[in-house]
């Protein structure tokens, strides 16, 4: 299954002295490209995720810390930090989509309730017309 999460930029900060690698990912969920974009409002997720922009962009950071007894390997540290940052990014994106889904389901339920009410009113009015035409 394909997701719409795209990492537009990756930055690393390596601290050899403390054996730490920090990875920063610039993430784009590409909301404007989604088929439901015309129905999506930032209000659906802004309260829970204020750091996500209107278009679905956000930044995540993660670090990899080497054990003091182990030998520091920058390449492995970068891979671990990037992987941890991606876990955060996909977690945030999934929870953002969950907020959007809940909001849209609530709207669909309200639309369905209104539809049922209109259908009932139509039946009542049809019966009223029949009675008036007798």
Question: How would you describe each model-predicted region?
Answer:
Residues 1-134:
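Catalytic phosphate/metal-binding cores of nucleic-acid and nucleotide-processing enzymes, i.e., regions
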